[in-house]
């Protein structure tokens, strides 16, 4: 009998990606070594219906925010990603220069507070 081959990380990642897709989750895999260290291999927002036994418990809200300069709008791909987050129950938005004046992010905080209160 041949010894079993070890399961490679690549195969595990593929299974996780399939599982998340089956759950209708919005997901992405950040590029390794291209950002903040320690970020998980998979980032996802999985739809979750709040049940009576969950009332009163803290539940996280996945948030995706795209920042844009004044007069700029998200690309079609960026809008598609934001729509995916919303479809899965997360909060997605883009904030542009009008809402986030340099040096004065109080306006941005107000936009975020309003969005969270609407949920």
Identify the meaning behind each predicted range.
Residues 1-119:
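Catalytic phosphate/metal-binding cores of nucleic-acid and nucleotide-processing enzymes, i.e., regions
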């Amino acid at each position: 009998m041949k010894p079993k081959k070890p399961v490679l990380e690549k195969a595990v990642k593929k299974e996780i990606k399939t599982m998340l897709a089956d759950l209708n989750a919005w997901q992405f895999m950040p590029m390794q070594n291209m950002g903040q260290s320690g970020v998980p291999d998979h980032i996802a927002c999985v739809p979750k219906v709040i049940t009576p036994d969950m009332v009163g418990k803290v539940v996280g809200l996945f948030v995706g925010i795209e920042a844009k300069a004044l007069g700029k709008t998200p690309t079609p791909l960026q809008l598609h990603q934001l729509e995916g987050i919303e479809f899965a129950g997360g909060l997605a938005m883009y904030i542009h220069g009008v809402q986030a004046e340099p040096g004065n992010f109080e306006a941005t905080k107000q936009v975020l507070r309003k969005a969270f209160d609407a949920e």
